[in-house]
A protein has these predicted regions:
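Histidine/acidic-residue-rich catalytic or RNA/ligand-binding cores of hydrolases
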Residues: 14, 98, 164, 168, ...
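C-terminal cap of metal-dependent C-N hydrolases
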Residues: 363, 373-451
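Divalent metal-binding segments
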Residues: 1-197, 217, 224-271, 275, ...
Length: 451
């Protein structure tokens, strides 16, 4: 069967394919060297507009040494009056210069960092300007083709935007290379209800490819920004911090109740163990159905609750690979189990796998590899091997039908391969499966054929 990515920010992933990527920077200085070269290249090409933001993606300052962290002075020295905004890999904070801070209307201190809800609001302002819509459509088409080349037939899109109207417009323009479930954020939920939408409704003009998704809510922050809400303090951080909630428990419950009473599933981001407990408590009180997004650290007593409440765990196995060293650094004494994939499965929880692109690349084979082998390289020991999944479970969690084979009557969403992934024995080989994709079919139509 064709593959699904159950957690994407599809517009931001498309932009990533055409923006400065800072994922390999090992310090603030290295990131700024990459930025300096990028600015020089664009200046030489005549594509640098002083009225438009220069945007970079995916820096990981949680892995940088304490004396190699972002500062406002350092980024200002490199960028001058050119507005520059850099997004962290987890998209939960940004590093901006003074020119961008003024233009965005955000306050920055000595670090130059903007976090959580303030950053989410600011980030949405970065993609405005002449020609932006045409350029975005070009990038979106490239992103759909890139996904199809990996065997992907569908995504859940949790872009922070007017997602329903956006995808209706995109389908009307012929952007039809994927099935899309378009999520709705809490601040737009009432409008969606007033417009008569419910989870599962078909988007007009999509020819059955587009549907309204769940109400996506972010309950807490992230591990890399030390803002995931935990019941025990982060290791080595002064002053002591437990992370933060994006909404109060009362607000979380209120939004869940509103969604549930009006035909919307919920997709609630929860990373820290205490955030997961709060979200599960709210779901239990409201009868909400849908998924917990990430479920990165769970108290042992909470693991069986997802299955009991009928909630899926929407997991991103590549995050475990990216975070394994950060976990050791900041979750030294956790009250819960991080990345409890196997424990959730054994408890009867439905698993849905995704990337959270652009946090990790939109590539289900990468997610499957991380889930099965627990490491990116045969040269490194698996991370928590007891939580690894078998291949059949990982593959089934990456399809729309929840199984590894097609039957007569199934939708003709499929991927053809010239190698059998079930026989793969190394993470490197599983991660190279995209080169074995011969073709991808969506609703009986080829969206990718290898030449």
């Amino acid at each position: 069967p064709g593959l699904w990515d159950y957690h994407t920010h599809f517009t931001q992933w498309a932009y990533t394919l055409g923006r400065l990527d800072l994922i390999d920077a090992r310090s603030a200085d290295e990131a700024l060297d990459m930025l300096r070269a990028h600015l020089a290249e664009r200046h030489a090409a005549g594509t640098l507009d002083p009225d438009q933001y220069v945007v970079g993606m995916r820096f990981r300052h949680s892995l940088w040494a304490d004396d190699a962290q972002p500062t406002l002075a350092a980024i200002d020295a490199v960028t001058g009056d050119q507005p520059v905004a850099l997004s962290s890999a987890d998209m939960h904070c940004g590093w901006v210069n003074s020119a961008a801070a003024r233009k965005l209307g955000v306050h920055v201190g000595e670090s130059g960092l903007v976090g959580e809800l303030e950053w989410f609001d600011a980030y949405c302002k970065l993609d405005k300007g002449p020609g932006a819509a045409d350029e975005l459509m070009r990038l979106l088409r490239n992103a759909e083709l890139d996904a199809a080349s990996k065997g992907v037939v569908g995504v859940r899109d949790y872009e922070m935007a007017e997602n329903i109207d956006t995808w209706i417009d995109r389908f009307s323009q012929g952007l039809d290379g994927l099935r899309v479930q378009a999520g709705v954020y809490p601040e737009r939920l009432q409008q969606a209800i007033d417009d008569g939408w419910h989870t599962g409704d078909e988007l007009p003009g999509s020819h059955g490819l587009g549907h309204v998704g769940a109400m996506k809510m972010i309950s807490d922050g992230s591990l890399n920004t030390r803002s995931a809400y935990c019941s025990t303090p982060y290791s080595g951080i002064a002053p002591e911090t437990f992370g933060t909630l994006s909404y109060t428990p009362e607000q979380i419950e209120s939004y869940m109740r509103l969604a549930t009473e009006h035909g919307f599933d919920i997709a609630c981001h929860a990373i820290g163990d205490e955030a997961n407990t709060i979200v599960l408590d709210c779901a239990e009180r409201t009868g909400a159905h849908g998924s917990i997004e990430h479920a990165q650290m769970l108290k042992e007593r909470d693991i069986p609750r997802l299955a009991r409440l009928g909630l899926a765990a929407s997991i991103q196995p590549q995050h475990a690979m990216d975070d394994r060293d950060v976990i050791t650094r900041f979750w030294g004494n956790p009250a819960g189990i991080p990345y409890a994939f196997s424990a959730l499965r054994k408890a009867g929880t439905k698993l849905l796998m995704g990337s959270d692109a652009p946090v990790a690349p939109l590539d289900p084979w990468m997610a499957i590899s991380a889930a099965v082998f627990g490491t990116e390289s045969s040269d490194r020991e698996p991370f928590q091997p007891e939580q690894c999944l078998d291949f059949a479970t990982a593959l089934a969690s990456s399809t729309a039908i929840g199984r590894t084979t097609l039957k007569a009557g199934d939708a003709a969403d499929l991927v053809l391969l010239d190698a059998d992934p079930s026989t793969v024995r190394t993470p490197e080989s599983m991660r190279s499966m995209p080169k074995h994709v011969v073709g991808t079919m969506l609703a009986g139509r080829w969206t990718y054929q290898r030449r």
